[in-house]
Amino acid sequence: MTVLITGASAGFGEAMCRTFVRAGFRVVGAARRMDKLQGLRDELGGSFYPLELDLTDRPSVAAALASLPPPFGEIDCLINNGGLALGLDAADRADFADWETMIETNVLGLAYLTRLVLPQ
């Protein structure tokens, strides 16, 4: 069984990667920071596949999923953990660009990735 976990380079995502690999699953760990993912690969071995992924770049998300090698290409479980928190100032001072980036990542990116993985 293969699990795709976004936000895998730190925090809950990183911890879930360790937990699932140690439980015997294959894990695709996706994040923007490949250097952190490579460190996890070194730690977790061949059951972990690092995938550089920017959820706001739809064409690259589709290409990244299409490039997954066997046996990692067939995703059985998606954990949409990736996200960020920007534009947290009071509404009258918050930067709209931060809000747009956060919505593109946390809402649209999640929806797009889910749609791509669902046909499997």
Feature map (PLM): residue ranges:
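Conserved glycine-rich cofactor-binding loop
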Residues: 9-10
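A short, exposed helix-loop element centered on a Lys and neighboring polar residues
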Residues: 114-115
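Conserved glycine-rich Rossmann-like NAD(P)H-binding loop of the short-chain dehydrogenase/reductase
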Residues: 23-39
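Conserved NAD(P)H cofactor-binding loop of Rossmann-fold oxidoreductase domains
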Residues: 82-87
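Substrate-binding pocket helix/loop in short-chain dehydrogenase/reductase
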Residues: 89-91, 95-100
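The beta1-alpha1 cofactor-binding region of Rossmann-like NAD(H)/NADP(H)-dependent oxidoreductases
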Residues: 53-63, 96
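Conserved hydrophobic beta-strands of the Rossmann-like cofactor-binding core
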Residues: 2-5, 78-79
